[in-house]
Regions:
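Specific alpha-helical transmembrane segments that line the substrate/conduction pathway
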Residues: 4-9
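A glycine-rich helix->loop->beta "capping" turn
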Residues: 1-3, 36
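Beta/alpha (TIM)-barrel catalytic core signal, keyed to glycine-rich beta->alpha loops juxtaposed to Asp/Glu
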Residues: 10-174
Length: 174
């Protein structure tokens, strides 16, 4: 059984009702537990929800990190209001939020480093924890390194202070 089956991108050449109808049929057959989408706007999620007759839309996998916060304007609030989990891909901004200072040489990197030092955590852990502090947001950081996997897992189970969140929000505005 597939736990979560997602549409990766909206496909305007195939009606969303047809696609989601087929996905709901897979749920009915016991082959899939939950249906989600990826890279859908709020309007596309509304259309998807209207097309679904038997199952809720449970997730939207989207680009989200400290550097790319545009979805906070409408998508995150909509998902929170509709019990849809946001699955943040590229939460470390291709490594630039993981302590690679050459990729983040401005004051933002200094703020991230300061918060990491204050917290006794790595910059990557701070960046991931910041994402996790948002409503209905989980992260899927990419790595092929066992040590980084452990480090990423240690981004949960603790919280940034409200002052630290404010510092990060100011350094990385929407």
């Amino acid at each position: 059984v597939i736990d979560l089956y997602q549409i990766h991108w909206s496909n305007r050449s195939v009606p969303i009702a047809e696609t989601l109808g087929a996905m709901e049929e897979l749920v009915d057959r016991g082959m899939v537990r939950y249906i989600g989408v990826s890279n859908f706007s709020v309007a596309e999620m509304r259309e998807a929800q209207q097309a679904m007759t038997k199952n809720p839309l449970v997730s939207n996998q989207v680009l989200y990190n400290l550097k790319r916060r545009e979805i906070e304007r409408d998508l995150i609030p909509y998902c929170a209001d509709n019990d849809i989990t946001v699955i943040a891909y590229t939460p470390l901004a291709d490594g630039s939020l993981a302590g690679r200072s050459r990729l983040l040489p401005d004051k933002r990197g200094a703020v991230l480093e300061q918060v990491a030092q204050e917290s006794g955590k790595t910059q990557a852990q701070v960046a991931l924890n910041w994402c996790l502090s948002r409503p209905n947001v989980i992260v899927i950081p990419k790595t092929n390194n066992v040590e980084r996997t452990v480090e990423n897992c240690e981004a949960s189970g603790w919280s940034l202070s409200s002052e630290q969140v404010t510092m990060l929000d100011a350094a990385f505005p929407i």
